[in-house]
A protein has these predicted regions:
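Active-site-adjacent loops and short helices of periplasmic peptidoglycan-processing enzymes
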Residues: 1-97, 106-107
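Domain-terminus/edge residues, biased toward the C-terminal soluble/receptor-binding domains
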Residues: 76-80, 88-93, 97-215, 220, ...
């Protein structure tokens, strides 16, 4: 989390005009933790590009193959990524199932979940960047939000004119954790739809142990 991420000219200026950003300038630096907070709370596109360059070691474009390989490892079957920020491209696509697979890995990380529940992004000025950056988390499912959901573990929104509103979220109640994916929805409907789906799941699903890994002649120990 403390590693330093450099912002190149391309990372700052390759983002689409009018897309979300936090006004970082070329040559400035943030820690990885600051970058992740900016991506999760503000959907900062130049930060996504800088992190992609940092991880790939070259260009943000070279990060896409890494994303695709990791997606396959997580069980994704209907996705192809060509950029690190999810803005529209005919060759960039995913599905609700695949977002749930990615979400399952994401929500297993407590530090990332905590970031999504933070009410305010605050990056203090430093020798690496001069600005006092403050952005309010507009997510309405978190505590204090208009649609605050008491069992929420974490969440991430997305929006483009093409895809409309997307919300991937996780909630836990009575030891059961559910992941909800809502796509091509509208704000604020996607909050209401997410809550309705979680409430349905918690009312109608229950935890069960899968024995599919056992051979035909084997019996679970607790049944012997």
């Amino acid at each position: 989390m403390d590693e330093i991420v450099d912002f190149s000219y391309d990372a700052v200026h390759d983002i689409d005009p009018g897309s979300n950003h936090i006004a970082i300038e070329p040559g400035e630096q943030l820690t990885m933790e600051e970058c992740l907070n900016a991506i999760l709370i503000r959907s900062a596109n130049e930060v996504s590009f800088a992190v992609a360059e940092h991880i790939s070691g070259t260009t943000w474009q070279d990060f896409a193959p890494i994303m695709n390989e990791r997606a396959k490892e997580l069980g994704c079957v209907d996705s192809n990524f060509v950029n690190p920020n999810g803005l529209p491209n005919e060759d960039h696509y995913t599905s609700a199932y695949d977002l749930a697979m990615i979400g399952r890995a994401f929500f297993a990380n407590e530090a990332l979940c905590k970031m999504t529940m933070t009410h305010m992004l605050h990056i203090l000025p430093s020798e690496r960047q001069p600005d006092d950056i403050m952005e309010v988390n507009k997510m309405e499912l978190i505590p204090g939000g208009k649609y605050a959901y008491p069992y929420l573990v974490g969440c991430k929104t997305g929006y483009t004119d093409v895809a409309r509103s997307t919300l991937v979220s996780c909630a836990e109640k009575d030891g059961m954790k559910l992941i909800c994916v809502v796509m091509k929805d509208e704000n604020p409907n996607y909050y209401e739809d997410t809550i309705a789906l979680f409430d349905y799941g918690f009312s109608n699903f229950q935890r069960a142990v899968s024995y599919t890994h056992l051979r035909a002649h084997e019996t679970p120990e607790h049944l012997v």
